[in-house]
Regions:
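Short N-terminal edge-element motif at the start of the domain
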Residues: 1-57
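Aromatic- and glycine-enriched beta-alpha-beta binding-site module
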Residues: 39-85
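A eukaryote-biased signal for long
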Residues: 118-211
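Amphipathic alpha-helical interaction segments
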Residues: 14, 88-89, 196, 204
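An exposed acidic His-Trp-rich patch
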Residues: 71-131
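Eukaryotic non-globular interaction segments with acidic/serine-rich, low-complexity composition
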Residues: 1-20, 115-131, 135
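Intrinsically disordered, low-complexity coil segments
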Residues: 17, 28-36, 61-64, 68-75, ...
């Protein structure tokens, strides 16, 4: 997302500093549903509290400086998830992507038969996989795990299936769009925070280096 798109989408309505606590309040305008959402970011005790209509996230696990941590040109949602201490919704929901499961099963079978790509497999093997996914699979991660485990065990007599199926299921889970949304907003705020503080006569350096 470009800077211009962020400016059009987000509107800072207030920034308030009380001691070493900084609060940033924003409105978010969404053209897709013609709605406006409210979000509050609170920086306090080297933690970041993100809350509002889009969910709640608390970051702070082993972060050296909360005001600099999220700065940059691209978000790092996977690494930042390790720094999230709490969230109102799962960052990785307990549903799996059926197409991704099928893709990862195909990759595993290719490795099992030591071929470089799926088309090199025997037609009989490809038919077995095709039949398995013809009508879809369970999307709940635990049921999907059991289903794929039994399938690979029965059809391919695979060994060490626990770790194999675990990797398949984990690889097929999609990260929460609300969490990614929050990461984008947090990074945009941190990238602009110093300028906003100057405009409001807030001592930004004091926030970076509290006494």
């Amino acid at each position: 997302m470009t800077r211009e798109e962020f400016v059009e989408r987000y509107k800072v309505i207030d920034i308030e500093k009380q001691g070493n606590i900084l609060t940033v309040k924003l409105y978010i305008s969404e053209n897709r549903d013609d709605k406006t959402y409210f979000v509050r970011l609170i920086f306090a005790d080297n933690k970041l509290f993100y809350s509002g209509d889009m969910g709640t996230y608390v970051f702070g696990e082993n972060i050296c400086n909360i005001f600099n941590f999220f700065k940059g040109e691209r978000i790092n949602e996977g690494y930042w998830q390790e720094k999230c201490e709490a969230s109102s919704y799962p960052i990785y929901p307990s549903e799996v992507d059926e197409e991704k499961v099928e893709e990862l099963v195909k990759e595993y079978v290719c490795d099992l038969y030591r071929v470089e790509n799926y088309e090199e497999l025997d037609e009989e093997i490809k038919d077995v996989i095709k039949d398995k996914f013809r009508f879809g699979i369970e999307t709940n991660e635990f049921r999907a795990y059991d289903e794929i485990y039994e399938f690979l065990k029965e059809e391919f007599d695979s060994s060490d299936l626990n770790s194999v199926v675990y990797d398949i299921i984990e690889g097929a889970k999609s990260i929460s769009p609300n969490y990614v949304y929050a990461c984008e907003l947090i990074q945009w705020v941190e990238n602009n925070l110093e300028d906003w503080c100057k405009e409001r006569n807030i001592n930004y350096e004091e926030l970076l280096n509290p006494r």
